[in-house]
Regions:
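Glycan-recognition and catalytic cores of secretory/periplasmic carbohydrate-active enzymes
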Residues: 1-198
């Protein structure tokens, strides 16, 4: 939703922008990445608040995501594209497993994560298992954290802790993944480290 060029040109609340019109996109056969992200969010909401409708929609969105296996990359503008959907589907599967204890979701999460560590490539040629800070484009680190929490296997946790130690093991420098939005990446890495250490 929105126009990134317009949004970046004005530094104010969206409702105060001079032209507050918003573009909205819809699909009936794609956007697996976005559908899975919403499925994950609704599953978390169900875990926190117990609203059965949230869980019902989370399951439906997850099924939609699995059915079409396409990213929303085409047609939504040039900003904040997600170049794959497997990481989002694994993220949703992890949260749906925690919400339902249905092993179907656990199996998908484990299948994705095991494939990612064997160098599976997605439709865009991205290398799975190469973690990065949580962002609109990649939530595989979060999926790996969920896998470690769900399985409790030391080998699953070691993948996460090895990555975090390689990136964040410095007391004298500011971690900077990318110069554009460096604080958000730093905060995302801190969140991942906190979630891993709990």
């Amino acid at each position: 939703v929105g126009n990134a060029d317009q949004d970046h040109a004005e530094w104010c609340a969206p409702e105060d922008q001079s032209d507050a019109s918003r573009q909205v996109y819809q699909t009936s056969n794609g956007a697996s990445d976005i559908a899975a992200e919403y499925a994950a969010a609704l599953a978390v909401n169900y875990i926190n608040f117990g609203n059965a409708e949230d869980l019902s929609y989370a399951k439906a969105l997850y099924e939609f995501s699995i059915k079409y296996n396409k990213t929303a990359e085409d047609g939504i503008g040039e900003f904040y594209r997600s170049y794959d959907y497997y990481d989002d589907q694994a993220w949703a599967a992890g949260w749906l497993y925690l919400a339902t204890k249905d092993n179907t979701y656990k199996t998908f999460l484990n299948t994705f994560m095991n494939a990612s560590n064997q160098g599976k490539s997605g439709s865009s040629g991205c290398q799975w298992g190469v973690y990065s800070p949580m962002s609109w484009n990649n939530v595989s680190l979060g999926s790996a954290i969920l896998q470690g929490e769900i399985t409790g296997n030391a080998s699953d946790w070691s993948k996460v802790t090895t990555y975090l130690n390689q990136k964040c093991n410095s007391e004298s420098t500011y971690y900077c993944e990318d110069s554009w939005g460096s604080c958000r990446y730093n905060a995302a890495m801190q969140m991942a480290a906190l979630a891993t250490s709990k």
